Amino acid sequence: MSLTSCESSDPVGLADPMKWSTVPSGLKNGELKVEAEGGSCLFACKNYKSFWIASVKEEGEFKENTSYKEFDGGWYLVKIEDNELKIIINRNETNASRSFTLCVEAGNAFDEFKFVQDAAKQ
């Protein structure tokens, strides 16, 4: 009689976290400050060939999205193509700062980024 035991160093069901080869300069702890003038930024995932939008929140409230590859928030646009995520943020002409949080998913791997745009200079 013999007994065999198997042990895995990777727990079953846990995916590798998403890793990024390209991120915008200024990204700190998942948050990016954006000037009132707006702009665009690019993220490139190096360990997943594709991923999709899991959720979008504006000022803490979930927004309804019908596409997993593109989201138009009116003052910002999120586009995913293959392993790249592009964010375009329009000029803020209001006297209030604004923000949105984007959660992306690749199977059981998730990542979240918050974008905070400055108010227009009066």
Write out the residue ranges for each language-model feature.
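Bacterial Sec-dependent N-terminal signal peptides
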Residues: 1-27
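C-terminal edge beta-strand
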Residues: 17-20, 84-85, 108-122
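Surface-exposed binding patches on compact interaction domains or structured appendages
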Residues: 20, 31, 38-86
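Eukaryote-skewed repeat-based solenoidal scaffolds used as protein-protein interaction platforms
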Residues: 26-29, 35
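Generic structural detector for well-ordered beta-strands
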Residues: 33, 44, 86-88, 103, ...
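A mature extracytoplasmic/lumenal domain signature
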Residues: 47, 91-93, 106, 119
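Short, solvent-exposed, Trp/other aromatic-anchored flexible loops in extracytoplasmic proteins
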Residues: 84-97
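A short beta-strand micro-motif common to beta-rich folds, especially ectodomain repeats
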Residues: 94-108
